[in-house]
Curated annotation (Swiss-Prot):
Pathway: Carbohydrate metabolism; D-tagatose 6-phosphate degradation; D-glyceraldehyde 3-phosphate and glycerone phosphate from D-tagatose 6-phosphate: step 1/2. Its EC number is 2.7.1.144. The gene is lacC. It catalyses: D-tagatofuranose 6-phosphate + ATP = D-tagatofuranose 1,6-bisphosphate + ADP + H(+). One of its GO terms (biological process) is D-tagatose 6-phosphate catabolic process. This is Tagatose-6-phosphate kinase. It comes from Streptococcus pneumoniae (strain P1031).
Length: 309
């Protein structure tokens, strides 16, 4: 079983409009509300793929109850309740444009943060792999993800970590390393304080920097150009076919689902990387974020080749 962790989930509300009119009333007919957050995208894809998954994180108030109720019934859920209210994230789709209004979310009390660590520690007993995704809510220290990684390491569970900014920096600077990180070029540039290109020789040098020491897998997303990966002392490039992308949002989360699944099933390097890339592409072909059509899985899988470089 895979444990997905979403520390700052949301109710994602979609308002489709032909035109967004400013300073007047806009009436929406077709409103969509879903359980949102990067970790919950991972959860949905794992469930659709057929893997057993347990979802956890922080929820609060009536919106928190709504969120838990709107997670697929096939998914096991064990969220931790806090005093603050779970946030809304609103996307206004007007024409070819998308305007987002994102609430800050709840401020987590120090004791709630400590209590969740105990909750997380107990959940580790029943899972084989952990996937931690997304931002931290206000109130939690910047090194909170490092604390989660430390507990997972102590329990002997591999961790796929998909966060960015100060939270990722804190993990990289701590002695407690995740099994996998999945930065993109922009995030690598932010971490190193210099521009990082997609040149393979440069990426090889970058991923051998002391900052990344101790991390078994570093899978760099190159968007439409596939992925570049360092696993131990071996480097891989995966090229992907051109596809008709409908909605690329959530493709990174779908890739995390594939990585986590590969670790769960102890797949070879090539199998894990192909699965991760295929699930990312399948998400991009769908309108709904964090959703894959498994009927198209094998056709894409057969087109991908992993090259050692």
């Amino acid at each position: 079983m895979i444990l997905t962790v979403t520390m700052n989930p949301s109710i994602d509300i979609s308002y489709p409009l032909d035109e967004l009119k400013i300073d007047t009333v806009n009436r929406v007919v077709d409103v969509t509300k879903t359980a949102g957050g990067k970790g919950l995208n991972v959860t949905r894809v794992l469930s659709e793929f057929g893997d057993s998954v347990l979802a956890t994180g922080l929820v609060g108030g009536k919106l928190g109850e709504f969120l838990v109720e709107h997670i697929d019934n096939q998914v096991k859920k064990d969220f931790f309740s806090i005093q603050g209210e779970t946030r809304n994230c609103i996307a206004i789709l007007h024409g070819d444009n998308q305007t987002e209004v994102l609430e800050k979310g709840p401020e987590v009390l120090e004791q709630e943060g400590q209590d969740f660590l105990e909750h997380f520690k107990k959940l580790l007993e029943s899972v084989e792999v952990v996937a931690i995704s997304g931002s931290l809510p206000a109130g939690l220290p910047v090194d909170y993800c490092a604390s989660l990684v430390e507990l997972a390491n102590q329990a002997g569970k591999p961790v796929v970590l998909d966060c960015s900014g100060a939270a990722l920096q804190a993990v990289l600077e701590s002695p407690h390393k995740p099994t996998v990180i999945k930065p993109n070029n922009e995030e690598l540039s932010q971490l190193l304080g210099r521009e990082v290109s997609e040149d393979l020789d440069e990426l090889k040098e970058v991923l051998q920097e002391p900052l990344f020491a101790g991390i078994e897998w570093i899978i760099v997303s190159l968007g439409a150009n596939g992925t570049f990966t360092k696993h131990g002392d071996t480097f891989y490039k995966v090229d992907i076919p051109r596809i008709q992308a409908v909605n690329p949002v959530g493709s990174g989360d779908s890739t995390v689902a594939g990585i986590s699944s590969g670790l769960l099933h102890k797949e070879s390097d090539a199998e894990l990387l192909i699965k991760a890339n295929v699930l990312g592409m399948l998400n991009a072909q769908e309108k709904m974020t964090g959703h894959v059509n498994m009927a198209n899985y094998q056709a894409l899988y057969d087109q991908l080749i992993v090259k050692e470089v």
